Amino acid sequence: MSKKYELYEVKDGKIVRKNPECVRCSHGIFMADHGDRYACGRCGYTQWKNE
C-alpha cells in the first residue's frame, strides 16, 4: 500500500515535498532518498546529492 502522505510536510501553512520528483517520469513519481543520492524506482534514474 502506498504511503505518499509520508513524502509531504506542512511548513508555514503550505504543503512541501520532502523528496524530489523524477525528471524522466511523470509528475507524482518521487525519488527515494539513499543518503548520498536520490534514485527513481520506476526508471532507474539516479541524481547525486551535492556536498
From Swiss-Prot:
SUPFAM superfamilies to which the protein is assigned, alphabetical: Zn-binding ribosomal proteins
Zinc finger (C4-type): 22-43
Cofactor(s) essential for the protein: Zn(2+)
Free-text remark on how the cofactor is bound: Binds 1 zinc ion per subunit.
Gene symbol of the encoding locus: rps27ae
Keyword DNA repair: no
MF term (GO), any: zinc ion binding
Keywords: Metal-binding, Ribonucleoprotein, Ribosomal protein, Zinc, Zinc-finger
GO annotation, cellular component aspect: ribonucleoprotein complex; ribosome
Quaternary structure and partners: Part of the 30S ribosomal subunit.
GO biological process: translation
Keyword Ribonucleoprotein applies: yes
Domain of life: Archaea
Residues involved in Zn(2+) binding: 22, 25, 40, 43
Protein name per the record: Small ribosomal subunit protein eS31
Family: Belongs to the eukaryotic ribosomal protein eS31 family.
